[in-house]
């Protein structure tokens, strides 16, 4: 289920727009994740106290974590599917330390798509959305395979 060179180029083009404000995009992705799936907030001790969208928007810690999440994802996307080295430590920490179910990775993938649609509607056409969804699915499938290797049933 790999992406063609053309699809990767589309993904990296839109990702270039994300990189102009990783922290802002990341914060928005996490806010959308927590609003759409409040149960995911339970996995984040640092953010459990944030109950409203305004509190989330005002949280520098949430913004920093959003930056961390999207920086890691960007590093993976830039590998165009050859992301074994980047994926292994991420899968390890998310399986053994954070215990993040694959389902939550689907939720955050949806949030990423929604934020891109919202912030970059003029550039986020059907082909862009399809390519990004495919790239995020590849990432999730590869994380799920690593989880299985680690014995995590997430």
UniProtKB/Swiss-Prot annotation:
Domain Globin stretches: 2-148
Residues reported in the UniProt entry to bind heme b: 94
GO biological process, one term: removal of superoxide radicals
Residues where O2 binds: 65
Modified residues (Phosphothreonine): 68
Sites bearing Phosphoserine, chain numbering: 4
GO MF entries: heme binding; metal ion binding; nitrite reductase activity; oxygen binding; oxygen carrier activity; peroxidase activity
Residues that, per the record, bind nitrite: 65
Enzyme class: oxidoreductase
Primary localisation category: cytoplasm
Subcellular location(s) per record: Cytoplasm, Sarcoplasm
Known function: Monomeric heme protein which primary function is to store oxygen and facilitate its diffusion within muscle tissues. Reversibly binds oxygen through a pentacoordinated heme iron and enables its timely and efficient release as needed during periods of heightened demand. Depending on the oxidative conditions of tissues and cells, and in addition to its ability to bind oxygen, it also has a nitrite reductase activity whereby it regulates the production of bioactive nitric oxide.
Family: Belongs to the globin family.
Name of the molecule in the record: Myoglobin
Protein encoded by which gene: MB
């Amino acid at each position: 289920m790999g992406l063609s060179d053309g699809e990767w180029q589309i993904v990296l083009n839109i990702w270039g727009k994300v990189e102009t404000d990783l922290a802002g995009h990341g914060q928005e992705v996490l806010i959308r994740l927590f609003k759409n799936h409040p149960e995911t907030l339970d996995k984040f001790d640092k953010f459990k106290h944030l109950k409203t969208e305004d509190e989330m928007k005002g949280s520098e810690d949430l913004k920093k974590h959003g930056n961390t999440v999207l920086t890691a994802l960007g590093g993976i996307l830039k590998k165009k599917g050859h992301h074994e080295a980047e994926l292994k430590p991420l899968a390890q920490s998310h399986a053994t330390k954070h215990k993040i179910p694959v389902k939550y990775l689907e939720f955050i993938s949806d949030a990423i798509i929604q934020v891109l649609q919202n912030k970059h509607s003029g550039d986020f056409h059907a082909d862009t959305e399809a390519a990004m969804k495919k790239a995020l699915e590849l990432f999730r499938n590869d994380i799920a395979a690593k989880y299985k290797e680690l014995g995590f049933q997430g």
